[in-house]
Amino acid sequence: MRALLSVSDKEGIVEFGKELENLGFEILSTGGTFKLLKENGIKVIEVSDFTKSPELFEGRVKTLHPKIHGGILHKRSDENHIKQAKENEILGIDLVCVNLYPFKKTTIMSDDFDEIIENIDIGGPAMIRSAAKNYKDVMVLCDPLDYEKVIETLKKGQNDENFRLNLMIKAYEHTANYDAYIANYMNERFNGGFGASKFIVGQKVFDTKYGENPHQKGALYEFDAFFSANFKALKGEASFNNLTDINAALNLASSFDKAPAIAIVKHGNPCGFAIKENLVQSYIHALKCDSVSAYGGVVAINGTLDEALANKINEIYVEVIIAANVDEKALAVFEGKKRIKIFTQESPFLIRSFDKYDFKHIDGGFVYQNSDEVGEDELKNAKLMSQREASKEELKDLEIAMKIAAFTKSNNVVYVKNGAMVAIGMGMTSRIDAAKAAIAKAKEMGLDLQGCVLASEAFFPFRDSIDEASKVGVKAIVEPGGSIRDDEVVKAADEYGMALYFTGVRHFLH
């Protein structure tokens, strides 16, 4: 038996090589892997000695040789292949262990294009693909996490075709991921990220019980190990719908730096939000906005879930809590609640991934765009359109309202008072209907909107929403502007003594 080991990530390769040697494998290797194995007392043959061909062009050509690829690719059960192998002095290679030049890491560490180009692996993917193609005869490894499993399988004599088939699938996933990143990087560097092709590659984290509905399959995939590093289940398992709501709640609650923010989300839209002096008070005021919709919702906590906050949340049924951190006493509060699910990022404050791009599936393809973000100075740079200026406290509330609006399905309007959302209308086909729905819900909840501020993610097409806002005592408004009737909206704000700001930035969300 013969194995070829050539890896960039050398974690565990010495131990793996020793185990293979003990199992009777002859070992071939290249470059740094060869040196490391030899230094650790493993009998190893350098590929250039095996092929009788030196490495060429500063190592660009090492394993691209018939004795390597012929040794991997020839079928052991095909008499003609066996004959050709003997005639050409090609010896079988039964195990290929390769991982690739660190192209992605290089692009993160350096902007030197020559260095980046040199870290595009050629021979590695070729060997992986060859071994994967001939999986019926050859084992292929590209992940150090598989070393132990492979050794155990070999020792037990369970190296069957089905085992190798699973390694083959993983190998093609690995090379596809590698090539996709290279293509995306080149398009990002030279075509602004919008080239002729776009590759979206994620790594599976776990299967969900089902998809959005019970008859659909579902799973969570991640970019750059984000969930593996920042998502830990303390109680229960996340469903497909939980994950989309967690995403919405986390994005909103984490948008205010280290502020003690609480966001409550249901079906992707906020039904409660507040920033008060502490997390308990933030939760109390967030819940007031719409305690009915909060039932069975997702609560995101930008800080630590402690016992006091846990007891307060436990007064009603929420399905999911996502907190930056959770202490043991808080977890004990929910011990008797079977249905609640609790997740943490094990961090002082909530962490967002800040993905650079966003995409949505449409039948026949997908649409792709830069991710939307509310700029740090968006409100600061907004243009005052009215005669009246907002007070310092009103400006704080306007910033909160503006960010909530950006994370809420269009059309929406958001009313905020003293750091807490007091009314919201969202997902409406008419902005005036959103305004009326928000006010009606606030009245139902017994909330006083007098002195609140108002934000809209897109312009007001008519003055009717301003007229409606005046009836409940709105004092300041922020919106993008851009309507052909902006003058009417400004005039209405002045009539009612409101402060009105145009940001010039729309935040549609569909």
Curated annotation (Swiss-Prot):
Cellular component terms per the entry's GO annotation: cytosol
EC number, as in UniProt: 2.1.2.3, 3.5.4.10
Signal peptide segment: none
Keyword Ion transport: no
BP terms from Gene Ontology: 'de novo' IMP biosynthetic process
Known catalytic reactions: (6R)-10-formyltetrahydrofolate + 5-amino-1-(5-phospho-beta-D-ribosyl)imidazole-4-carboxamide = 5-formamido-1-(5-phospho-D-ribosyl)imidazole-4-carboxamide + (6S)-5,6,7,8-tetrahydrofolate; IMP + H2O = 5-formamido-1-(5-phospho-D-ribosyl)imidazole-4-carboxamide
Highest taxon, organism lineage: Bacteria
Pathway(s) served: Purine metabolism; IMP biosynthesis via de novo pathway; 5-formamido-1-(5-phospho-D-ribosyl)imidazole-4-carboxamide from 5-amino-1-(5-phospho-D-ribosyl)imidazole-4-carboxamide (10-formyl THF route): step 1/1; Purine metabolism; IMP biosynthesis via de novo pathway; IMP from 5-formamido-1-(5-phospho-D-ribosyl)imidazole-4-carboxamide: step 1/1
Residues covered by the MGS-like domain: 1-142
Cited InterPro entries: AICAR_Tfase_dup_dom_sf, Cytidine_deaminase-like, MGS-like_dom, MGS-like_dom_sf, PurH-like
MF annotations from Gene Ontology: IMP cyclohydrolase activity; phosphoribosylaminoimidazolecarboxamide formyltransferase activity
Keywords from the named record: Hydrolase, Multifunctional enzyme, Purine biosynthesis, Transferase
A Pfam family recorded for this sequence: MGS
Gene3D superfamilies per record: 3.40.140.20, Methylglyoxal synthase-like domain
NCBIfam families given in the database record: PRK00881.1, purH
Domain notes: The IMP cyclohydrolase activity resides in the N-terminal region.
Stated family: Belongs to the PurH family.
Record protein name field: Bifunctional purine biosynthesis protein PurH
Source organism of the structure: Campylobacter jejuni subsp. jejuni serotype O:2 (strain ATCC 700819 / NCTC 11168)
Gene name, Swiss-Prot/TrEMBL: purH
